[in-house]
């Protein structure tokens, strides 16, 4: 099968972490014998005209390459670009929602442009039952497939060489992987860590809240790293923390569990669907006392935590 993958997030040399979760998907589709071509945006920021260019690129690829199906990631704007490409080639559109696209549906442009995508797609996929429920409530009559992208257990296998922990910081070593934005609750995590009163906390990622984290005692911000380096960072930590205000799926938590690491994850979104009591601690992200208590419980769990990998598999 010839698959045209359309997305507004795809890694590049300049931004190796952008949409890196899609790389294993392409690899596995090709391993199954499918041909995959990508129409994508590979940088953050810039003019909104980049979305028009994505649509033009996707339509050109569809007309030139003649795929059997268009597979768009994110309802908007990639979904709209994918719908145009599918119509140009006369083939079905499959679109996958990842979370931020659904959160943006209360804004006028995404709301107006997403409805025809949902109605015109042969299949709509959500990465968690929680996200599927939100979509189905918004679009009566819609029946979402639920299929997360998962984790390749070969890439996130116990025994990965650990990264050098900044300053050889003390245990317990806590790690947070992701964008440093309000939704990820990174400041709340740093505040809870300060109240924990011991250990070290490393953030792998970047974003507008970096300045609110740097300079705190025991806290280091490493910045963005290629996705291939994430297993080494997880292997170096004792606990992976993802107490987001909302997390539609929670890929970083699943990756950590695959590497036998305990996780602290949010109750808001997808993590309750796979984080078991033996694998980690679920906390209400806006409850500061619960987050502090969750960190206390998590750092008392075994390292490595073999039950976490069992749950991830």
Each model region followed by its residue ranges:
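Nucleotide-activated donor-binding/catalytic signature segment of Leloir-type glycosyltransferases, i.e.
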Residues: 211-228
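Acidic anion/phosphate-binding donor-loop and adjacent secondary structure
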Residues: 105-106, 151-166
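Carbohydrate-associated surface elements
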Residues: 130, 150
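Conserved acidic donor-binding segment of nucleotide-sugar-dependent glycosyltransferases
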Residues: 277, 281-288, 297-303
């Amino acid at each position: 099968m010839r698959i045209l993958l359309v997305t507004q997030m795809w890694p590049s040399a300049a931004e190796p972490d952008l949409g890196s979760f899609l790389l294993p998907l392409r690899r596995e589709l090709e391993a199954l014998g499918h041909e995959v071509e990508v129409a994508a945006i590979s940088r953050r920021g810039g003019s909104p005209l980049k979305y028009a260019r994505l649509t033009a690129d996707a339509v050109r690829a569809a007309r030139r390459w003649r795929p059997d199906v268009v597979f768009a990631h994110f309802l908007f704007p990639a979904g709209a670009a994918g719908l145009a490409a599918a119509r140009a080639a006369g083939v079905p559109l499959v679109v996958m929602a990842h979370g931020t696209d659904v959160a943006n549906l209360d804004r006028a442009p995404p709301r107006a442009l997403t409805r025809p995508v949902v109605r015109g797609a042969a299949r709509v996929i959500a990465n968690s039952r929680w996200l599927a429920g939100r979509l189905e409530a918004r679009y009566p009559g819609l029946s979402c497939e639920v299929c997360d992208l998962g984790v390749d257990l070969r890439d996130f296998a116990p025994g990965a060489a650990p990264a050098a922990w900044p300053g050889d910081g003390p245990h317990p070593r806590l790690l947070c992987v992701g964008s440093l934005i309000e939704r990820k609750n990174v400041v709340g995590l740093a505040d809870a860590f300060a109240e924990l009163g011991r250990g070290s906390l490393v953030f792998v990622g970047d974003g507008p809240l970096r300045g609110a984290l740097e300079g705190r005692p025991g806290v280091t911000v490493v910045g963005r790293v290629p996705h291939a380096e994430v297993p080494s960072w997880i292997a170096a930590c004792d606990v992976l923390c993802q107490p987001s205000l909302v997390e539609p799926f929670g890929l970083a938590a699943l990756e950590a569990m695959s590497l036998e690491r305990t996780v602290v994850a949010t109750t808001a979104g997808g993590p309750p669907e796979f984080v078991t009591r033996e694998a980690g601690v679920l906390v209400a992200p806006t409850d500061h006392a619960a987050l502090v208590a969750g960190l206390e419980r998590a750092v008392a769990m075994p390292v490595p935590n073999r039950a976490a990998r069992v749950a991830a598999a």
